[in-house]
Amino acid sequence: MKKKLMIILLIILIVIGALGAAAYFVLGGKSEKSEAKKSIDEIVASSVDVEEITTNLKSDNIIRLAIKLETDSDKSKEELEKRDFQVKDAVISLLADTNADQIEGDKGKETFKKELKDKINSYLQEGKVEKVYITSFNLQ
């Protein structure tokens, strides 16, 4: 009787341990530190350049900017290249609702980049844009 009880308890402990290990790996056992950062070559390979756009702001100022979009995969890069017209539309639409003082400074640019990333990601079916880089910026 005691031997059967010990075997049952041992089996239960093994099952609990296996479930715990599985949950650890499935639910994100990787910490941010353990995830490898992309090399610069990988970033460049998975990025899309958006040609310079000149448009009016809500405040009647003119802005000229160019951006680079970093994607999470080759598939999302390919899709993004096909959707370049939607990306340009998203940039122009966001800027049309923006005053010059809203986009000046680091905080304004970061807000614009986040809004643009969210809008572009809503179009994508394969992957996502991970980062938006402003590569040229001229506000008049």
Curated annotation (Swiss-Prot):
Function: Controls the rotational direction of flagella during chemotaxis.
Keyword Membrane on entry: yes
One CC-aspect GO term: bacterial-type flagellum basal body
Organism ancestry: Bacteria, Bacillati, Bacillota, Bacilli, Bacillales
Topology with respect to the bilayer: Single-pass membrane protein
Native organism: Bacillus subtilis (strain 168)
Protein name in the entry: Flagellar protein FliL
Gene Ontology BP annotations: bacterial-type flagellum-dependent swarming motility; chemotaxis
Localization, UniProt: Cell membrane
Family: Belongs to the FliL family.
Gene name of the record: fliL
Keywords: Cell membrane, Chemotaxis, Flagellar rotation, Membrane, Transmembrane, Transmembrane helix
Annotated Pfam families: FliL
Sequence intervals crossing the membrane: 7-27
Domain of life: Bacteria
